[in-house]
């Protein structure tokens, strides 16, 4: 269930100025439509989907690192890095895996080949640490050393999006066939030692645990809620189901939220309605909220609107021992039949609609985990930057006079800081993401953030963002 309000939570003082400037593009240009660029969660690598391939670029050198090719017969639309599972150490690279979603109806699981992976990735780690390693800089890029180790089949039409849960245990895929599939990694669960990891690192075994078919149209995107304190904190829903929550966006103009109930069944717990066109994507808030409130959710689409959704805070009594299944009469816990449990439905509300900037479909929005800034791109070629602010209304007439989008604040407390028109020339921009900087021009390698846009022109372009 979803309702719409215009409440806002005051935030830190607003920035007065913002500047977005282009950095040298990743090389080489791809010279064909590119769909998305996905940064690795911890290594200085970013994977770009295009044609039948994925090109992995180095964030240290802004050049090609490796290529995944030969596994798909149609365009690769999406990709996701598997988060490290079990013990995390300097040998984390041994479990480097990427999943790709393709228009050929399949998802592919790729592993970096052991023969060259350690040498190449250790080079990236040296560059990441800021060492002035001239020899590393001059090394030739590695040959294509990716191996397609598993193909996930089941969808009847194009796979539009793939996304891992925070633990890496689950993978979600969605398709034009109106379904969302959830897969579980059962090949190497929670390795407890480096020796065990060494023995099992090449095992890839996935099982289908759910096929969700409640959307009435093409499912465009899926996104798992990140593992931030609010996901399990005071304002998290009572334990009538597991911690993982998945959001899906659809051609049917809705967003659906999914959770695993006490019987291990994945169920729809909320339908978010309000968009007047296809919902192209969803993104979760990655920064912890004040008082450990549950993470908010973004949605955007063909109606040129970006919405912010918040979980309605439950009544205090719902957090009692009975609701949590931890004692008392266990009235609503896991130990009673489905028919006797309280409804699994959650109530979400639209707490903000961002100021309108785009004239055309909004294809991608990114939410910074460091600053909380939002950035958006779409079919009009505009790159926009937003900031959350106090619940006031402002308008910067100077921006409007200069032909820029006027700086305004919506009822929900967001304003436009700046825009870049024609960020990829006349071409549509399909994707935007925040990621860490490791290149030579960075003043704080591994800490400073930049934006990366991916467009129909085949250019993967980084952008420096300066806020004052």
Curated annotation (Swiss-Prot):
Question: Would I find Repeat among this entry's keywords?
Answer: yes
Chloroplast recorded as keyword: no
Q: Which PROSITE patterns match?
A: WD_REPEATS_2, WD_REPEATS_REGION
One record GO biological process: iron-sulfur cluster assembly
Q: Which InterPro entries match?
A: CIAO1/Cia1, WD40/YVTN_repeat-like_dom_sf, WD40_repeat_dom_sf, WD40_rpt
Q: Note the segments forming the WD repeats.
A: 71-122, 154-193, 214-268, 274-319, 357-396, 423-468
Q: Which stretches of sequence are listed as region Disordered?
A: 185-204, 314-335, 391-411
Biased region (Acidic residues) positions are 193-204
User: Any idea what job this protein has?
Assistant: Essential component of the cytosolic iron-sulfur (Fe/S) protein assembly machinery. Required for the maturation of extramitochondrial Fe/S proteins.
Annotated family: Belongs to the WD repeat CIA1 family.
Q: Which HAMAP family would you find in this protein's record?
A: ciao1
Identify this protein by name: Probable cytosolic iron-sulfur protein assembly protein 1
- Source organism per UniProt: Neurospora crassa (strain ATCC 24698 / 74-OR23-1A / CBS 708.71 / DSM 1257 / FGSC 987)
């Amino acid at each position: 269930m979803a309702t719409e309000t215009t409440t806002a939570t005051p935030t830190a003082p607003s920035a007065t100025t913002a500047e977005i400037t282009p950095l040298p593009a990743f090389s080489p240009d791809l010279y064909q439509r590119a769909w998305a660029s996905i940064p690795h969660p911890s290594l200085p690598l970013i994977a770009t989907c295009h044609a039948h391939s994925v090109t992995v670029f180095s964030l240290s050198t802004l050049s090609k690192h490796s290529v995944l090719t030969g596994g798909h017969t149609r365009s690769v639309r999406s990709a996701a890095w598997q988060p490290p599972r079990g013990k995390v150490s300097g040998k984390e690279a041994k479990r480097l895996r990427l999943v790709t979603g393709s228009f050929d109806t399949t998802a592919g699981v790729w592993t970096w080949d052991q023969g060259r992976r350690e040498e190449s990735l250790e080079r990236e780690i040296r560059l990441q640490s800021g060492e002035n390693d001239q020899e590393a800089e001059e090394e030739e890029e590695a040959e294509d050393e990716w191996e397609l180790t598993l193909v996930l089949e089941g969808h009847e039409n194009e796979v539009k999006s793939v996304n891992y849960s925070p633990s890496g245990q689950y993978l979600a895929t969605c398709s034009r066939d109106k379904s969302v599939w959830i897969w579980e990694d059962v090949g190497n669960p929670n390795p407890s030692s480096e020796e065990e990891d060494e023995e099992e690192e090449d095992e890839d075994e996935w099982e289908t645990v759910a096929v969700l078919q409640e959307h009435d149209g093409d499912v465009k995107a899926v996104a798992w809620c990140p593992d931030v304190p609010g996901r399990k904190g005071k304002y998290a829903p009572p334990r009538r189901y597991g911690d993982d929550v998945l959001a899906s966006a659809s051609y049917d103009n809705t967003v659906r939220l999914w959770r695993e109930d006490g019987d291990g069944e994945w169920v729809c717990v909320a339908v978010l309605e309000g968009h007047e066109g296809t919902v192209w994507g969803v993104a979760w808030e990655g920064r912890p909220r004040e008082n450990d409130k549950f993470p908010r959710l973004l949605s955007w689409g063909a109606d040129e609107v970006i919405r912010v959704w918040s979980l309605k805070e439950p009544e205090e009594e719902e957090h009692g021992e009975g609701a949590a299944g931890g004692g008392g009469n266990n009235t609503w816990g896991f130990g009673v039949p489905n028919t006797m449990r309280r409804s699994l439905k959650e109530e979400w509300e639209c707490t903000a609609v961002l100021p309108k900037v785009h004239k055309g479909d909004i294809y991608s929005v990114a939410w910074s985990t460091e600053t909380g800034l939002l950035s958006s791109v779409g079919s009009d070629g505009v790159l926009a930057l937003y900031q959350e602010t106090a619940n006031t209304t402002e308008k910067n007439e100077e921006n409007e006079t200069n032909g820029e989008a006027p700086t305004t604040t919506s009822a929900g407390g967001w304003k436009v800081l700046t825009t870049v028109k024609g960020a990829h020339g006349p071409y549509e921009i399909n994707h935007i993401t925040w990621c860490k900087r490791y290149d030579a021009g960075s003043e704080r390698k591994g800490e400073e953030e930049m934006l990366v846009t991916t467009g129909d022109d085949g250019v993967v372009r980084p952008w420096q963002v300066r806020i004052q």
